């Protein structure tokens, strides 16, 4: 793609913007020579490899092919997203350490967003959208923000469709809940409405039957794990292309996404980081339950938004993904939101006295 800029610039820009390049000429001259333009399998969904290829083609203009320049630029995008997410979280709490912990100190989020991977762009879009959408909701309405928000949503749609599907209903429910006290009812209604919309759309456009698409994706993933004898594969029953099959699989799907890998599934040292991270997150959730505090109405609405996004995303991942390594990677967009939602309730002053009066904890609470 990059070489076309110097040999046939018009072809470069057509491929960069995806306009007028869906023909045999471009397939023969360019696409067939690219390693990842076409995926080894086609599940009928958007090909998220191509946006990363296009971004790196643009970066190469200034990087001259140096890998580390690409890594630095993508890390900068990830930092912009993380910083924007931190600004959003700080609006809802006066505790800086809770924000730092949720955004910057989760190992899997830092690891997967630090390379030349889709997660860096994903975090960039999520963070910027969250911050700018909040400003649109609670500050003066400015139409100039709308095109930018739609652009960020388009990035999510192209980059990770399952994140887009989880994020949009949660965002819309957060927006609607601003005008009512029935926050949970609004979010539940949005989820049910989304499912009904998907079922209706499947009747009109059979190729967009989301239940069949997810069942096929899970089937392909299971077969792939068996064909390559993946070390971190887990047992999973095949989904049937009907709603009842998905409902029955929901509890196990959420358990897989929230808790695995388990200590009994450790097969190498690489299993320990996600295990310890899961234990840490579960520990925070438990502490927030027993040593929690009341939150304001505005905070409560944001917490439910965070939980709705996390649960929908975890459910999609748990239903379709039979490989632990993939589960760990796929769920990182929701981890900062889940962690912050738990920390919003946590009140360190309610801990046992010998812990609450620890000098380090006192310093953290008073200075951060």
Where are these regions (language model features)?
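Loop-to-helix entry region of an early transmembrane alpha helix in multi-pass inner-membrane enzymes
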Residues: 43-46, 50, 54, 62-80
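Hydrophobic, aromatic-rich transmembrane alpha-helices
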Residues: 82, 253, 257-263, 271-299
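Transmembrane-helix signature of polytopic, membrane-embedded enzymes
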Residues: 85-105
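Membrane-interface helix-loop-helix junctions at transmembrane boundaries of multi-pass membrane enzymes
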Residues: 87, 91, 141-144, 271-272, ...
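Short acidic/glycine- and proline-prone juxtamembrane loop motifs at membrane-interface regions
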Residues: 115-122
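Alpha-helical transmembrane segments and terminal signal-anchor/GPI-anchor hydrophobic tails
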Residues: 148-277
